[in-house]
Amino acid sequence: MIYYLDDLGLPFIYSSLFTNSRTLKNRPILVQRFVAGLAEAVYLVEKNPQQAMAAVGKILSIKEPEILQSAYDAYAKRLINRRMVVPPKMVAETIETAREEGTSVRRMPADIFDNTFVENLEKSGFLKELWKGEIPEERKKP
């Protein structure tokens, strides 16, 4: 049986970049460029579904069109966060779920993520230019 993560009522974060605080502090230009590249990849996948499915099929050795379409619909349409902003509430819920399951998490949610680099893309006009004038919703409604 297959489930959509968002149908399970469990917190999850999608479309994010993970790095350490040293890289954020010492190489912010590299991080900013990588986040811009991630934004371009999100755009490319949405606007070029056949190319995206061909790439996924090649990497995962999937040839069945129905499986590729299903994966594309789930990840490129339903789950992808087009704005790439990490939702603070989702981080807090994820940490709380981990704590309830017995994981020791000492840090506060706000200390675990940084939306500065994504916010810079919006402030600079990068996202608006990339998406041809209209910055998309975080996720498409099913």
Task: Give the positions of each predicted feature.
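Ligand-binding "clamshell"
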Residues: 1-6
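Phosphate-binding core of ATP-grasp and ATP-grasp-like enzymes
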Residues: 10
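A bilobed periplasmic-binding-protein/Venus flytrap-type ligand-binding module shared by bacterial periplasmic
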Residues: 13-30
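Secondary-structure end/capping motifs
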Residues: 26-107
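Conserved C-terminal helix/tail region of periplasmic/extracytoplasmic solute-binding proteins
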Residues: 99-142
